[in-house]
Amino acid sequence: MTKYVAVIDQGTTSTRCMVFNKQGEIVAQHQLEHEQICPQAGWVEHDPLEIWERTKDVIHGSVAKAGLVAADIAAIGITNQRETTMIWNRKTGQPYGNAIVWQDTRTDIVCNQMSAEGGQNRFQAKTGLPLATYFSGPKIRWMLDHYPGLRQDAEKGEALFGNMDSWLIWKLTGGPGPAAVHVTDVTNASRTMLMNLKTLDWDEELLSAFAIPRAMLPSIRPSSDPEFYGFTRQDGPFGGEIPICGDLGDQQAATVGQVCFDAGEAKNTYGTGCFMLMNTGTEMVHSNHGLLTTVCYQFGHEKPHYALEGSVAIAGALVQWLRDRMRVINTAADIENLAKLVPDNGGMYFVPAFSGLFAPYWRSEARGLIIGMTRFINRGHFARASLEAAAYQTREVVDAMQADSNVSLKVLKVDGGMTANDLLMQIQADVLGVPVVRPKVAESTALGAAYAAGLAIGYWKNSDDLCQNWGVDKSWKPSGDDTLRTKNYAMWKKAVTRTFDWLDESA
């Protein structure tokens, strides 16, 4: 009997279930968006119960499209938006509030207070991360401080913290109920600011600094676990017992999906944000140029692989904003044709610092800026500048990564929804001055989670099996001369500096 691997890909704007075959090809998929809740400036939330309902719906839709039953599915992998934080009650399964999304900046006060006590990099040696609103630790602390009765429940082990992977695994394994499993993997745990990168365990010093009870935290497991996290339920959305044995944060999953298994290999994912990861092997490399040190993956009981990461908060989210808030376009795909109407940006730059700036600046007080406007500017320039924002932010991350690793980028592997935009990919090649390559399966995030689950059960034997599945769909070579490339990049950098200190009352 032919078997398949199913993946739940829980992202920032949508949830989908995808079914893969042994060749790494998509057999079926179903996707649904969920609401972006913005109760006040700087706050971004998701409803965990809505996401669970969407998850059940996409599982049913995908399995039905593939014409499969539970017995046809060998294993399940999970991949998720990282850092997004929720806390729920162990007995009732009810969240204490909406999930606080990774883009949310309400924890700025927490981060500033802790930075004042020991500097923004006070935990970097252990966590590889700067103190920033991006990560889960400050979000948990904020919830504990603001939700009545939560701290008491957390100390008794009745309140459970999780990123979306933990929440979905808990629900899929029967939560609330005695069989429910409360776990996460090393990649997601490495984004909390609470895990020690060397021990791969929760760190008591970090927990004490954030005043977070250990009893509320999930157990940390490998990204590909031959011992399985647990099994889906007969009465659950899959309709049978299937092992859940792969779990990675979305960007680490994409790195696995792009088969970046050797030190020095890198990929860039274009989704809600932009995220570039470079595999540094089994050795940690700490950044001096604003990048993050993170766990890349851990397969079974092997040593973990680490990565340098450059995180950009806003990429595809800018296109979504143009569609939903500004009504500049009707669909996200319209941005490409609109941008094609002009040969360049007309001197206009758009720095989308909606949630501050992430790598390499880490400036939470920065805010979005459009500069260089004249009466010559039209909707086409606006669209092109929006695409260029993703390309220029990626260039900044590449520069930092090359400085930290002393490795020059020869080619950029890309994936994610925005890579369907051929114009953006050409702009990216032009901005970087190196070729850009899109694989046959551009949805590398879900594929990476499938690989992790499949390796755990022997569906694929090893990384060599996975590398054979990778192939080029399309590539773009850089055009234009270096003088113009340097000039335009300098203008972008100048625009970025104008966003600094916007929320600084003393400025």
From Swiss-Prot:
Residues that hold sn-glycerol 3-phosphate according to the record: T12, R82, E83, Y134, D250
Q: Does the keyword Cytoplasm apply?
A: no
Against InterPro entries, the record matches this protein to: ATPase_NBD, Carb_kinase_FGGY, Carb_kinase_FGGY_CS, FGGY_C, FGGY_N, Glycerol_kin
Q: Where does glycerol bind?
A: R82, E83, Y134, D250, Q251
Quote the pathway field: Polyol metabolism; glycerol degradation via glycerol kinase pathway; sn-glycerol 3-phosphate from glycerol: step 1/1
Where ATP binds, per the record, is at T12, T13, S14, T272, G316, Q320, G417
Activity regulation as described: Inhibited by fructose 1,6-bisphosphate (FBP).
Record-listed ADP binding positions: T12, R16, T272, G316, G417, N421
From the UniProt record, list the reaction(s) this protein catalyses: glycerol + ATP = sn-glycerol 3-phosphate + ADP + H(+)
The reply on keyword Cell inner membrane is no
Q: Which domain of life is it from?
A: Bacteria
Q: What is its EC number?
A: 2.7.1.30
| Endpoints of the signal sequence | none
Q: Which CDD domains match?
A: ASKHA_NBD_FGGY_GK
Using the UniProt record, name the top-level EC class of this enzyme in a single word. Answer: transferase
Q: Which GO terms describe its biological process?
A: glycerol catabolic process; glycerol metabolic process; glycerol-3-phosphate metabolic process
Mind listing the UniProt keywords for this protein, alphabetically?
Answer: ATP-binding, Glycerol metabolism, Kinase, Nucleotide-binding, Transferase
Single GO cellular component annotation?
cytosol
Q: Per its database record, what is this protein's job?
A: Key enzyme in the regulation of glycerol uptake and metabolism. Catalyzes the phosphorylation of glycerol to yield sn-glycerol 3-phosphate.
| Similarity comment: family membership | Belongs to the FGGY kinase family.
Protein name in the entry: Glycerol kinase
- Supply the source organism for this entry: Beijerinckia indica subsp. indica (strain ATCC 9039 / DSM 1715 / NCIMB 8712)
Taxonomic lineage per UniProt? Answer: Bacteria, Pseudomonadati, Pseudomonadota, Alphaproteobacteria, Hyphomicrobiales
